[in-house]
């Protein structure tokens, strides 16, 4: 489906003048952000359409009830169009950025005045092919450009800026088809569909009236009959959520819960979540030494991170020795499982401490005696009493006799000694024990008391 435009409309210069005025208004709209480099408004000098545009309707959908609305997909083709605009720019970039630049970075210039340059930009041989969605309603026409193919020739009065401006225009051309042209077409269609007898001064009043009609109230989305189909349980939940969030306070409205919304942790309740995490400090502080709960929360608690609580035993628990190693191991294992929940192969690193007591000489002697008593069978043998000779003077003593230093009254001689492996180590460290007595060299005696080199006699 296609149709032709009226050639008389494009042949008359009034159409081009109307397009020029609308385009100038759109480019100088107060809602647009004005660039600092522009020292004046943008003026559209000339608009020309020597070739009549072509419009091909690809799809059309007309809805008469309940609203009069026509939807269509169209293909627009335009050739040999021309556009010329003029403005004034500021060439002194130091003056533009003076307000936003710190004073210590600005050089001390002799003259930092304004230097404006008038510039004229001409777009010629404009060729446009676009696929558009058109919505036709009583107030006007709304159009949106989906697929745009644009080509043009650009000429600038300042040749040194021509390449830079052309590159930036091609990069920002999507803004023209997204915002400028749709608003221009809509405003033109509003003026076109209104009665010719009415003045243009009544158009803003009608636009405000149309805006008031299209403003949606609360009852537009849900009517009174729609509330009967809603679940009362869902409505109760929604009302509780809304009431819990209708506050500007940093503290929670419900002090006994972690969050007013299930599954959502709020910032003001973070310290409660941290206090319930398994740690040595939290466990022993809550069990053995309970602290009074207060409804007020300090600012330090709100911003205090988890690592500041220190996974350590409180000093009072250490002083009173009220800790349990099994409980500590369980808490540390839970902390390890929480931190390595994604890694199944991770194993905790246990610190093993071997407790070894240092052996004193008294302990060594007692352990050696106990080992010998347990591992050896000792038979008590009465020793032969020996009369201790009376020491004489040094001149009267025979040369082959010597007095002993000391003689023990009782000495036990083991007949059979069976040593264990453990007792060998201990007995090797013991000092040797010797029996020292008289050594008789007479041939009449068949025995002699043992010295260091010879053992005592056995009977």
UniProtKB/Swiss-Prot annotation:
Region (Disordered): 338-375
Membrane-topology descriptor: Multi-pass membrane protein
Entry keywords, A to Z: Lipid transport, Lipid-binding, Membrane, Mitochondrion, Mitochondrion outer membrane, Transmembrane, Transmembrane beta strand, Transport, Ubl conjugation
Residue ranges of every copy of the SMP-LTD domain listed in the record: 1-190
Record field: compositional bias (Basic residues): 348-359
Entry keyword Ubl conjugation: yes
Gene Ontology terms: biological process: mitochondrial genome maintenance; mitochondrion organization; mitochondrion-endoplasmic reticulum membrane tethering; phospholipid homeostasis; phospholipid transport
Post-translational modification: Ubiquitinated by a SCF (SKP1-CUL1-F-box protein) E3 ubiquitin-protein ligase complex containing the F-box protein MDM30. Ubiquitination is important for mitochondrial integrity.
InterPro entries: Mdm34, SMP_LBD
Chain intervals with Basic and acidic residues compositional bias: 338-347
GO terms under cellular component: cytoplasm; ERMES complex; mitochondria-associated endoplasmic reticulum membrane contact site; mitochondrial outer membrane; mitochondrion; outer mitochondrial membrane protein complex
Keyword Transport: yes
Quaternary assembly: Component of the ER-mitochondria encounter structure (ERMES) or MDM complex, composed of MMM1, MDM10, MDM12 and MDM34.
Role, per record: Component of the ERMES/MDM complex, which serves as a molecular tether to connect the endoplasmic reticulum (ER) and mitochondria. Components of this complex are involved in the control of mitochondrial shape and protein biogenesis, and function in nonvesicular lipid trafficking between the ER and mitochondria. MDM34 is required for the interaction of the ER-resident membrane protein MMM1 and the outer mitochondrial membrane-resident beta-barrel protein MDM10.
Other remarks on this protein: Present with 377 molecules/cell in log phase SD medium.
Domain comment (free text): Lacks alpha-helical transmembrane segments, suggesting that it resides in the membrane via beta-sheet conformations similar to those predicted for other outer membrane proteins and porin. The SMP-LTD domain is a barrel-like domain that can bind various types of glycerophospholipids in its interior and mediate their transfer between two adjacent bilayers.
Protein's UniProt name: Mitochondrial distribution and morphology protein 34
């Amino acid at each position: 489906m296609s149709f032709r435009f009226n050639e008389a409309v494009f042949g008359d210069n009034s159409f081009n003048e109307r397009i020029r005025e609308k385009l100038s208004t759109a480019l100088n709209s107060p809602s647009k952000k004005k660039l600092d480099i522009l020292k004046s408004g943008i003026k559209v000098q000339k608009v020309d359409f020597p070739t009549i545009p072509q419009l091909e309707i690809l799809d059309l959908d007309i809805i008469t009830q309940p609203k009069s609305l026509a939807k269509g997909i169209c293909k627009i083709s335009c050739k040999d169009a021309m556009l010329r605009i003029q403005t004034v720019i500021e060439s002194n970039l130091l003056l533009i950025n003076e307000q936003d630049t710190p004073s210590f970075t600005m050089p001390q210039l002799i003259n930092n005045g304004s230097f404006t340059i008038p510039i004229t930009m001409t777009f010629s041989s404009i060729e446009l092919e676009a696929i558009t969605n058109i919505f036709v309603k009583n107030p006007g026409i709304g159009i949106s450009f989906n697929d745009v193919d644009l080509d043009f020739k650009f000429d600038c009065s300042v040749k040194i800026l021509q390449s830079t401006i052309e590159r930036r225009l091609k990069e920002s051309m999507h803004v023209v088809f997204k915002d400028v042209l749709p608003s221009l077409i809509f405003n033109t269609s509003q003026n076109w569909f209104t009665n010719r007898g009415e003045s243009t001064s009544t158009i803003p009043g009608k636009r405000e009236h149309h805006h008031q009609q299209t403003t949606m109230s609360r009852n537009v989305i849900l009517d009174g009959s729609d509330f009967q189909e809603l679940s009362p349980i869902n409505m109760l939940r929604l009302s509780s959520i809304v009431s819990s969030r209708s506050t500007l306070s940093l503290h929670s409205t419900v002090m006994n819960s972690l969050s007013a919304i299930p599954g959502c942790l709020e910032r003001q309740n973070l310290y409660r979540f941290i206090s319930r995490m398994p740690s040595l400090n939290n466990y022993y502080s809550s069990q053995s030494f309970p602290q009074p709960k207060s409804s007020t929360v300090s600012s330090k608690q709100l911003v205090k991170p988890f690592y500041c609580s220190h996974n350590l035993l409180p000093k009072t628990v250490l002083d009173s020795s009220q800790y349990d190693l099994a409980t500590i191991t369980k808490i540390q294992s839970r902390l390890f499982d929480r931190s390595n929940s994604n890694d199944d192969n991770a194993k905790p690193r246990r610190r093993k401490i071997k407790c070894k007591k240092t052996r004193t000489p008294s302990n060594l002697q007692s352990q050696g005696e106990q080992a010998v008593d347990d591992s050896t069978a000792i038979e008590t043998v009465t020793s032969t009493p020996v009369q201790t000779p009376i020491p004489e003077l040094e001149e009267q003593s025979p040369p082959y006799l010597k007095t002993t230093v000391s003689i023990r009254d009782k000495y036990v001689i083991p007949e059979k000694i069976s040593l264990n492996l453990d007792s060998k180590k201990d007995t090797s460290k013991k000092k040797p024990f010797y029996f020292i007595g008289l050594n008789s060299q007479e041939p009449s005696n068949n025995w002699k008391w043992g010295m260091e080199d010879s053992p005592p006699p056995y009977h």
